[in-house]
Regions:
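Active-site nucleophile loop of the alpha/beta-hydrolase fold
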Residues: 145-156
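Alpha/beta-hydrolase fold nucleophile elbow
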Residues: 112-124
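Glycine-rich "HGGG/HGxG" loop immediately N-terminal to the catalytic nucleophile
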Residues: 77-93
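N-terminal cap/lid segment of alpha/beta-hydrolase-fold proteins
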Residues: 1-41, 276
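Short glycine-enriched nucleophile-adjacent loop
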Residues: 127-138, 144
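Serine-hydrolase catalytic core
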Residues: 7, 11-13, 22, 61-63, ...
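Short, surface-exposed "cap/lid" segments of acyl-processing enzymes
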Residues: 25, 35-78
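Alpha/beta-hydrolase active-site loop
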Residues: 91-112
Length: 313
């Protein structure tokens, strides 16, 4: 693992306990990392979503113990059909999120551990699943970390990403051997056909492509809640091309007081996939830092900085 645990984090590791959640599609295996009793309580439970529950290089394990040492409780779990959970597995589609799984975990934590307020974090499919929880649990969710997720149907994402290409891009692509090898895959042929079609028609306008109905419904539930949210993308992410349509439409229509709850960050390069170690660590650090700022002590310190008064102890 790419980190060394502090004594406080090791204590949180030893305090972890597994539990099982009954969900409609299977019994979900989960791990609770309880907040350090000596830390100022955040009164928030952070639920991290991915497959498997540890994420790449066990970064959600690292995050769970670091946050718990600061007074957050945390939960990581396996979706149905994944890892140690029961149920049937299937190809994942961000527009068909596993809402029942995450809602079951939230309600189990409330009933069994007395947790009342939650923060959800995930990337791509997991971000869309986290967002979907607002439809049934918006009143109990205080924060959302939404990393590099598509907000259109997957076939539409391909089209909107194709609209960022031109003939010069296609010409350069012809001279890359990896592109020719990739054409052995049927899905790559379909993608290339879409790119050529969109470029040849010179549509160049993603505005003619719709956002996913599921995203719009879940986004409206987020708006109705009082939660804060961080939306983070890479400029070169295919998913960002679809999110730009959301920026121009559903985000632009928000009242100022609602829009102020949502932060949008677009970084150079890519964020999606966590495939490159340096960017993975940068994204992880940003997500944890954003969550840490939700701690009441952090908010009190920021308020004191603005007023010039000492923060309450």
């Amino acid at each position: 693992m790419p980190w060394s645990e502090t004594p406080a984090e090791l204590a949180r590791a030893r305090a972890e306990r597994p539990f099982v959640v009954a969900a409609p599609s299977g019994r979900l295996f989960a791990v609770l990392t309880p907040a350090a009793p000596e830390a100022p309580p955040a009164d928030l439970c952070v639920v991290t979503l991915t497959r498997p529950r540890s994420h790449r290089n066990r970064m959600w394990v690292e995050g769970a113990r670091r946050l718990a040492a600061q007074g957050f409780s945390t939960i990581r779990f396996d979706y149905h059909g994944c890892g140690d959970s029961s149920g049937d597995s299937a190809p994942l589609d961000p527009n068909r999120p596993y809402r029942d799984d995450v809602v079951a975990v939230i309600r189990h934590a409330r009933q069994q551990f007395g947790v009342q307020r939650f923060v959800l974090a995930g990337s791509c499919f997991d971000a869309r699943t986290a967002l979907s929880a607002f439809a049934g649990e918006g009143a109990s969710i205080a924060g959302l970390v939404f990393l590099a997720a598509p907000v259109m149907e997957l076939d539409t994402v391909v089209q909107v990403h194709a609209d960022t290409k031109d003939w010069a891009h296609l010409w350069r692509a012809l001279f890359k051997p990896d592109n020719w090898r990739a054409l052995a895959q049927p899905k790559r042929w379909k993608y290339m056909a879409t790119v050529v079609d969109r470029v040849s028609r010179q549509s160049g306008n993603a505005g003619d492509l719709p956002l996913s109905r599921g995203f719009i419904e879940d986004f409206r539930a987020l708006v109705r809640s009082r939660a804060r949210a961080l939306f983070l993308y890479g400029l070169e992410d295919a998913e960002y091309a679809s999110f730009r349509v959301a920026e121009r439409t559903v985000f632009a229509e928000l009242p100022a007081e609602v829009r102020a709850r949502f932060e949008i960050e677009v970084w150079p390069g890519t964020v999606h996939g966590f495939l490159e170690m340096t960017r993975q660590r940068e994204t992880f650090a940003r997500a944890l830092g954003w969550i840490e700022a939700l701690h009441p002590n952090a908010r009190a310190a920021r308020s004191a900085d603005r007023t010039g008064l000492p923060a309450a102890s």
